Amino acid sequence: MEAKRSRRPIERNVAMELVRVTEAAALAAARFLGMGDKNQVDAAAVSAMRFVLGKVHMDGIVVIGEGEKDEAPMLYIGEKIGDGSSLRVDIAVDPVDGTTLTAKGLPGAISAVALSARGTMNCPRQVVYVNKIVAGREAKDVVDINAPVAEHLKNIARAKRMKVSELTVVVLDRPRHEQLISESRGAGARIKLISDGDVAASIQAALPETGVDVLMGIGGTPEGVLSAAAIRCIGGVIQCKAWPRDDKE
């Protein structure tokens, strides 16, 4: 999932408006921090994000959102949003990536919005999960999602001028990752398990001096697209590969 086409950058004033959008969603969700109800967290964030997005100077269409139109009252896929200005964009939203974390009073949740020129953002909704690898910009020439785990970690460590034993790999704590965790530890790397929030973890893996060097494993496709958008802005490398759950996908 590495974009090759050049894209016209989003105007700076619109980018600043998006800060207000995520700020509103985060503040609304924070009212339910530690209250134990992730649905309240999500509902508050969705409502606040939708309200502020409606005032942004753009003609937007939601391509990644809260679900199909019959599944979500707001921020559904295909919803038109913004004040109808001339800037035509695709929008990806996740009002809170980490609703369970927020409900439990834990860190790691993030509110995310990504914009790109109309017709340039794609999310293959028929495939729910993607396998992804994220690392910092120094590893951009060595990341290969098809390489064996041990070889991959060795190459990333060399690019970062570290030993494999000094690498910290963040992985979602899921049964499907047992082999990945075993192979990573077998290669000598440390594992940091997270219960949720792989968008924030992807950003950490791409930035220096965060205590995280690599993110690996299978997560949601929408989160993969949002992570890719963030890493396109901040630098780093991300590779994604569809992970179909069955023959239908």
Q: Residue locations for each model-derived region?
A:
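Solvent-exposed alpha-helices and their adjacent loops that cap or buttress functional pockets
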Residues: 54-55, 80-86, 94, 102-106, ...
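Acidic beta-strand-loop-alpha-helix segment within the catalytic core
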Residues: 112, 118-194
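Gly/Ser/Thr-rich active-site loops/lids in small-molecule metabolic enzymes
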Residues: 189, 195-199, 212-214, 219, ...
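DPxDG-like acidic metal-binding loop motif
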Residues: 86-97, 101-121
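Short acidic, glycine/serine/threonine-rich loops at helix termini
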Residues: 74-76, 104-106, 115, 125-127, ...
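General beta-strand structural signal in soluble alpha/beta enzymes
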Residues: 62-66, 91-93, 102-104, 123-124, ...
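N-terminal subdomain of lithium-sensitive/metallo-dependent phosphomonoesterases centered on the IMPase/IPPase/PAP
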Residues: 1-92, 151-154, 158, 199-200
